[in-house]
């Protein structure tokens, strides 16, 4: 599939299958995350692949998204501002931008593997 088609076909899916994801597909997705660029190659991003039922239950408990309850896996992308590149002119820290780039690589790779995603930003940080 070419990139333009991939980008156009990717959407936020609300009907998540509980079917396990093949390890080859997960490896390809991980490689796409690793290949994502970061500002000045500082790499302030960390990615967690959550698959255990116990860990998935914890993830589900902090979000209001009911469709997530059938998901067999979840990628969590975070950044460490202390490790991000900071632009001198205005002190903008690029750690969150870098995390967004990595997350986008993950989502597009998932789509390329014939799977579906949704971006979840609505969660309880306190939990």
Q: Which residue ranges define each predicted feature?
A:
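Acidic, surface-exposed loops and disordered segments
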Residues: 1-127
